[in-house]
């Protein structure tokens, strides 16, 4: 049975993520990390979901039962776990979060001792241990060999200092009014402190988590409220994070949501202007707009494509010796400062770009026009191989004939089919999207 999806393990808490399942997974992961153990410490953080307590306690029980010492740091962004795992010399880091999913879901993400997400072969190795009944039951420790657990509440300061170091030292935010939407999630403490300490005039919304309101009509998936607040307070910028703050959505001074591909383009060129790029390559996923590639080419930069998921962006960046890349969804990686997508690092870089451009954000963050794209997430009941659907191949051939770029795939974390179309003719695009929607509703719903 495959346990890992595109971003760790994710599912409904109490259904897939039961205490027994989580304990078994924790033991399997712990045994895998033991093979390369240097410090016998594992770091655990979480977002603000109510079920995080259950998952955390199950993981602590599992890891201490096989001799690991566990450090619990409470609600923190996913990129903070990646950073602190390496900074605190831990064998591994674990983030308990289902990212942008509703509060009923939860998930578990693993990081190696260097703060990188696990590769697929590492996940497969953990899955093999998970299914090895004899190995699991022979691994419990007794007496003094049982591990310990301690909670540390002040590590947030380390991450805040790290974030501030990512911001250019010759700048401050005193001239900017910024609205932050922390999605009632993991960034609710960190984000306001960072921006306030750098001098910004800060308004914070959705910063009162109650365990059940994470991502609820707020944050990166629902930026309309942020857009309204930016216009209401005449702010210079608005930043919306998702539940674990590895994703960022930007709103300009006019209340417009800045497209992720425009953000990738303008940030890439900004990094180049500072001689901050380690290569001429910038990494984006196959979902990126063709206009991004053309814009980067005009700036003597090359776009490298990879599979969807910030883990694959990171791997492709390492392969191409690149230090900047991301997804149009808002997972953007500045690997000089973060091994995974970090919404806060990205927000600070966007702020610096706007300051140094000496333009309002609606101008500074609008460097090129995009080709028309349409993206829908279709709720489905089943996930048969797409190639097995009668008429599917003919549909793709027709799209190719009409020069409509297409990307159709199942979500790795939810029962959804993602359909992306791109074409120069917007009316044709809308017509074909409706046709595809009806086709898949008839076969999968």
UniProtKB/Swiss-Prot annotation:
The modification Phosphoserine is found at residue 99. Its EC number is 5.4.2.10. Activated by phosphorylation. InterPro entries: A-D-PHexomutase_a/b/a-I, A-D-PHexomutase_a/b/a-I/II/III, A-D-PHexomutase_a/b/a-II, A-D-PHexomutase_a/b/a-III, A-D-PHexomutase_C, A-D-PHexomutase_C_sf, A-D-PHexomutase_CS, Alpha-D-phosphohexomutase_SF. Its cofactor is Mg(2+). One of its GO terms (molecular function) is phosphoglucosamine mutase activity. Keywords: Isomerase, Magnesium, Metal-binding, Phosphoprotein. It is an enzyme of class 5 (isomerase). It catalyses: alpha-D-glucosamine 1-phosphate = D-glucosamine 6-phosphate. Pfam families: PGM_PMM_I, PGM_PMM_II, PGM_PMM_III, PGM_PMM_IV. GO terms for cellular component: cytosol. It comes from the Bacteria. The active site is at residue 99. Belongs to the phosphohexose mutase family. This is Phosphoglucosamine mutase. It comes from Helicobacter pylori (strain Shi470). The lineage of its organism: Bacteria, Pseudomonadati, Campylobacterota, Epsilonproteobacteria, Campylobacterales. The gene is glmM.
């Amino acid at each position: 049975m495959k346990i890992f999806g595109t971003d760790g393990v994710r599912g409904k808490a109490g259904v897939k993520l039961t205490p027994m399942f989580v304990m078994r997974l924790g033991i399997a992961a712990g045994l895998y990390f033991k093979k390369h153990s240097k410090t016998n410490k594992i770091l655990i953080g979480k977002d603000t979901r109510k079920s995080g307590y259950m998952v955390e306690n199950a993981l602590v029980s599992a890891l201490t039962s096989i001799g690991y010492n566990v450090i619990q740091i409470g609600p923190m962004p996913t990129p903070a776990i990646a950073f602190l795992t390496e900074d605190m010399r831990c064998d591994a880091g674990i983030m308990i979060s289902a990212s942008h999913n509703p509060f009923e879901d939860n998930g578990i993400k693993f990081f190696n001792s260097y703060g990188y997400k696990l590769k697929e072969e590492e996940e497969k190795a953990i899955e093999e241990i998970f299914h090895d009944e004899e190995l699991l039951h022979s691994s419990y420790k007794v007496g003094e060999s049982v591990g310990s657990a301690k909670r540390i509440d002040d590590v947030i300061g380390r991450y805040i200092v790290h974030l501030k170091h990512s911001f250019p030292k010759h700048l401050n935010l005193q001239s900017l009014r910024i609205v932050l939407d922390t999605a009632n999630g993991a960034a609710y403490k960190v984000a306001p402190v960072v921006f306030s300490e750098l001098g910004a005039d800060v308004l914070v919304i959705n910063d009162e988590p109650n365990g059940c309101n994470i991502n609820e009509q707020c944050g990166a998936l629902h930026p309309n409220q942020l857009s309204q607040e930016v216009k209401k307070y005449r702010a210079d910028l608005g930043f919306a994070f998702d539940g674990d703050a590895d994703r960022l959505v930007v709103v300009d001074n006019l209340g417009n949501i800045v497209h992720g591909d425009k953000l990738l383009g303008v940030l890439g060129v900004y990094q180049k202007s500072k001689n901050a790029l380690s290569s001429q390559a910038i990494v984006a996923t196959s979902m990126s707009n063709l206009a991004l590639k053309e814009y980067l080419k005009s700036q003597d930069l090359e776009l490298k494509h990879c599979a969807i998921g910030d883990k694959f962006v990171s791997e492709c960046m390492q392969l191409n010796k690149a230090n900047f890349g991301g997804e149009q969804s808002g997972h953007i990686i500045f690997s000089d400062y973060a091994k995974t997508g970090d919404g806060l690092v990205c927000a600070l870089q966007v702020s610096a770009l706007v300051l140094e451009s000496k333009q309002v954000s609606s101008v500074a963050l609008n460097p090129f026009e995009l080709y028309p794209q349409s993206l829908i997430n279709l709720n489905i009941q089943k996930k048969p191989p797409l190639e097995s659907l009668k008429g599917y191949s003919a549909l793709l051939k027709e799209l190719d004939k009409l020069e409509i770029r297409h990307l159709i795939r199942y979500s790795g974390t939810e029962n959804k089919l993602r359909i992306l179309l791109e074409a120069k003719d917007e009316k044709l695009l809308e017509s074909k999207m409706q046709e595809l929607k009806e086709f898949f509703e008839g076969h999968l719903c």
